[in-house]
């Protein structure tokens, strides 16, 4: 069914695209069989949704909010609570920096305000909508999806979806670090029948090894405030002090 077949889209649509969870490498179809390829495939699917809306009669009256599930289920040098979000559609500022702190709840509150829905609980009731990202004078917008050139390594039928498709990064064809056989062996015994059925800590380390290589895995942050009394915390000593001399054992 085409987007405009019914001429009556619902006021709110929730859409889940889950290939960015990655997995099932031995069974993956059309060569989308490594994490890099699966994430690129998922990104392209999101782009195609936005592309379809942007070139439809609903473009002037549809806002699209995009967030990730389990955006960072694991530590690195940045707080593991961080995430990304995208907003596309009319009245969205473009090419501007907005220095506001938003959370997923901010996004939910914004959707509620736009649709005239009452807050669900105290959590979203106490959060401001994301008004700083909007400019009501900006009505024109468009978007054309462009797949990553990573996907050139697959058998995805681009021409059936987008004739004369243009790849986002110039058409070069980088290769994943490891092939499907490596990933299938590393995840043997894993359950990929649905998201989040495996030990996330174990899988995170496999993903790190397979996509980053020999770089050490990030240590999990303790959350302790180490700004005060750092010398004592690090057990620093006076560098002028010498270690005591220990006499050699007697030959007797």
Task: Please name every model-derived segment.
Residues 1-252:
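N-terminal pro-sequences and low-complexity stem/linker regions of secreted or lumenal proteins
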């Amino acid at each position: 069914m085409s987007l405009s077949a019914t001429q009556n889209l619902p006021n709110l649509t929730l859409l889940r695209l889950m290939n960015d969870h990655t997995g099932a490498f031995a069974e993956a179809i059309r060569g989308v069989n490594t994490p890099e390829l699966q994430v690129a495939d998922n990104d392209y699917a999101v782009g195609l949704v936005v592309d379809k809306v942007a070139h439809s009669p609903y473009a002037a009256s549809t806002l699209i909010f995009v967030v990730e599930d389990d955006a960072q289920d694991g530590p690195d040098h940045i707080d593991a609570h961080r995430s990304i979000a995208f907003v596309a559609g009319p009245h969205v500022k473009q090419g501007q920096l907005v220095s506001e702190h938003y959370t997923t709840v901010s996004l939910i509150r914004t959707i509620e305000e736009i649709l005239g829905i009452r807050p669900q609980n105290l959590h979203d009731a106490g959060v401001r909508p994301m008004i700083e990202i909007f400019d009501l004078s900006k009505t024109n917008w468009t978007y054309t999806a462009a797949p990553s050139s990573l996907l050139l390594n697959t058998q995805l039928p681009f021409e059936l979806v987008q004739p004369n498709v243009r790849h986002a990064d110039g058409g070069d064809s980088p290769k994943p670090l490891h092939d499907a056989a490596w990933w299938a062996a590393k995840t043997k015994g894993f359950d990929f029948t649905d998201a989040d059925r495996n030990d996330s800590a174990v899988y995170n380390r496999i993903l790190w090894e397979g996509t980053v290589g020999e770089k050490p895995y990030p240590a999990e942050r303790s959350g302790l405030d180490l700004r005060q009394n750092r010398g004592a915390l690090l057990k620093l000593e006076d560098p002028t002090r010498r270690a005591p001399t220990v006499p050699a054992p007697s030959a007797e």
